[in-house]
Structures are given as C-alpha cells and as structure tokens.
Amino acid sequence: MGGTALRTFEGRTIGWALCGSHHTLALVLDVMGQMCQAGAEIIPVVSAALAGTTTRHGTGEEHVRQIAEVAGRAPLTAIPEVEPFGPQRTLDVLLIAPCTGNTLAKLANAVTDSAPLMAAKAQLRNGRPVVVGLTTNDALGLNAQNLARLLVAKNIYFVPFGQDSPHTKPTSLVSHFDLCPDAVLAALEGRQLQPLLRSW
C-alpha cells in the first residue's frame, strides 16, 4: 500500500468477515495486518465453518486466536453480536474475505444464517458498502447466477478476481487478496475497483 492508502485508513472502521476457506487464511491475515498498520480499526467477524472446523491448515481455535492477534480484538462469531451493526451504524465498510461459494450463494439470495451474512445484511440496511473477496470452485458453474446477481447489486463491490486454475478447475474464481486495501478504498468512494477481471 502506498502513502495514499496509509492516510485514508486512519479513522476508518472496517468489518472483516472471514468464511471457511482455510487455505487462504494466512494470506488474508497478512493483508489484514497491513491495513491495521495503516490505521484501520478492524472488527473481525468469523463464520462457524471457520471457527469450528479442524483441517490440515489448523484448528478453529487456532484460527480464531490468529485473527484476534492480528486485529487486536476477539472475533465476533454469533448473529446477535453483529446484528447491532445495523442500528448503531458501526461500520464504514464490510469486507468479506475470504468469501466462499456457500456464503456467496446465501448473500445473493438474502439468507442470513451466519455472523458474516448478518453483518452484510446490517451493512446493506444502512446503504453502506460491502466488498466481497471470492474464493470458490463453482463461481463459473452453479454459482454463476449468484455471482451475476451480486455484480449488479447496489452497494456490493468485489476484490478483483480471475481463474486461478482454468485448465484443472475451469469454474473456479479467486480474488487477488493483495488488492483488498484498494478495493475497500474504491468502495468507500462508491466505485468498483477496475479492472475487475485479472489473470493469475
């Protein structure tokens, strides 16, 4: 991030929702740390899939602890904890990264059964920006209709993405998570960071 980003994040409250894409967590946390250092106040929100699942990438408890260390506060994990984001107008922007295909589909269809989705609903209630950082194997498959719905939705923006493995996983899309800071800044200005489609 350059000097402009460093200045702009001062005084900004950013909700950061993390879903169950365990293999991208280390990269996402590195970017979160950069944004904290740039002056952002990060309020982490974690899905049950991330907080309660053990994979080869670690346990849910380990992930929650790592997120708390980077953000400087314990993640919110329950729907009642994030529901006040709406009436209290807590967030300047909500970033969902990583956003799984499951969360993408539910967001597109107004399903609110997790803390990240409740945070998004609360944010959209206030007409404030939600930024989506994708990582899903079916974005160009069965989830394509949900992606299309969100691409044209008001106040929803995306971290630029591309096909990470077009020959072995032709329907997969992954956002360039290093662009999260720029995507957030653009969303705060009411615009989509361009170009949206970027190769890997």
Over which residues does each language-model region extend?
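A cross-family phosphate/adenosyl-ligand binding-site feature
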Residues: 1-130, 135-200
